[in-house]
Amino acid sequence: MKKILIIFSGGQDSTTCLIHYTNIYKEIYCITFDYNQLHKSEIDSARFISNYFNVKKHIFVDLKCLKNLSISSLTDEKISILDNHPLNFSLPSTFVPGRNILFLTLSSIYAFNHQINSIVLGVNEIDFSGYPDCRNAFLKKMNDVVQIGMNCKINFQSPLINLSKAEIWALSDYWNSTQFILNNTVTCYQGIQGKGCGQCQSCILRNDGFNKWKSNPSYYMKKLKEKFNFDN
């Protein structure tokens, strides 16, 4: 039985991954992390979406301790989401140090114990906010660590890693899911469902990508088909 575990936030990218893999895998598992993020509505969105697509199992992991360990505007309302990170000005304040390291580690533990060999993370390094833990180089190193440390063949998959936001919208269009994603996902750092606040970096990237795709859907579908493996 083909099984896959999706690290699922309830945002545009992870939802696009979920929709894509429902057409490939028989059993889909989702894992969502509550790290005391201010935009908690994404957890409600994740729960609704996974129920809608009738995934095999969806677990929610309490990681509220991360707020006490890691400084970020996503967990501290006193820090502006528009500023640079107070400890590293080359990063946005929305960067949560160690977040994806923890997400991938804990997801690997779950996958190992449920005999799941594929873990999906909907990260992207074309149109992204500059997070170092959303880069392909990071994912490859983390995958090596997990395989060596657990003596397993778990593979990390990042199907959106080389796609622009416009191409990600084209992928949702390919699966006739654009309107669903527009209406039901939470990508906004303010936790506003749908189009979001329109001001945070996440909203800007999402809306800019949507407008580009909408201006020329056939062009971005062609670009998507040149780059994307629809069978994996």
UniProtKB/Swiss-Prot annotation:
GO terms for molecular function: ATP binding; ligase activity, forming carbon-nitrogen bonds; zinc ion binding. Disulfide bonds: none annotated. Pathway: Purine metabolism; 7-cyano-7-deazaguanine biosynthesis. Zn(2+) binds at C188, C197, C200, C203. Its EC number is 6.3.4.20. Belongs to the QueC family. Catalyzes the ATP-dependent conversion of 7-carboxy-7-deazaguanine (CDG) to 7-cyano-7-deazaguanine (preQ(0)). This is 7-cyano-7-deazaguanine synthase. It comes from Buchnera aphidicola subsp. Schizaphis graminum (strain Sg). The lineage of its organism: Bacteria, Pseudomonadati, Pseudomonadota, Gammaproteobacteria, Enterobacterales. The gene is queC.
